Amino acid sequence: MKTVLCLLPVEQRHKEKLERAAGAECSFIYAGEHGATGENVAAANIILGTPALKLINASEKLELLQLNSAGAEQYVRPGVLAPKTKLTNSTGAYSKAVAEHGAAMLFMMQKKLYLYRDAQKRHEWADFGTVTSITDATVLVVGLGDIGRHFAGIVKALGAHVIGVKRRPGEKPDCVDELYTMEMLDEVLPRADVVFSVLPGTPAATHLYTAERFDLMKPDAIFINCGRGAAVENSVLY
């Protein structure tokens, strides 16, 4: 009998699906998002979720850790997992949600909806001036994984000219009009009305957006980061 520790916010219908898929060979502990303890983690053969590193303690009993996040950087550090433990993540599971969130943020900024929302709360009739449109805008998507491609498809369908940047050369997907590698980033940044970044937490992406790169952007460019926060050198934002 395998013990499965579920740290996900599941409903009864989810539990039924999990138990049906696992069969009689597994027993489940449903602890919720914040219910991981040293005791239930140590008892688990399989964990679904993202337990605190200190609780795992390189457990020899743990056979599989299925993260409910795409990022797995902290779990691959030496000493976190036992050598036999398999680690899987949720890459691709959030592409629609994150891309649509990024699109919503873009439209909010282009149409100054945050200003009008605040004015509405103050019961003020205000005019905040010129707004911009996604139609005919040049949108630079830095990182063409699942999220980047989904976002590119959204803005392209609405009339944007989409430039994609990725790490390695490859065939141009239909969701972009132009495709470049990261070595060309500085060449295309000045062209963008919108920069949408969705980079992973890798050493190469850490502090990629320096003061010098922000200076390359148009003064009125919109920058949206839906990837790892470490891609931006935070001190240059203030």
Give the predicted meaning of each segment.
Residues 1-86, 210:
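An N-terminal-biased, well-structured beta-alpha scaffold segment characteristic
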Residues 40-41, 56-59, 134, 187-190, ...:
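A short, aliphatic-rich alpha-helical micro-motif
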Residues 68, 86-92, 183, 227:
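Short beta->alpha connector loops at strand-helix junctions that form conserved
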Residues 83-138:
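Phosphate-binding beta-alpha-beta segment of Rossmann-like dinucleotide-binding domains, i.e.
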Residues 144-145:
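Glycine-rich Rossmann-fold phosphate-binding loop(s) that bind the pyrophosphate
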Residues 148-149:
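N-terminal Rossmann-fold NAD(P) dinucleotide-binding loop
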Residues 163:
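Conserved beta-strand positions in the Rossmann-like core of class I SAM-dependent methyltransferases
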Residues 169-238:
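Rossmann-like adenosine-cofactor binding region
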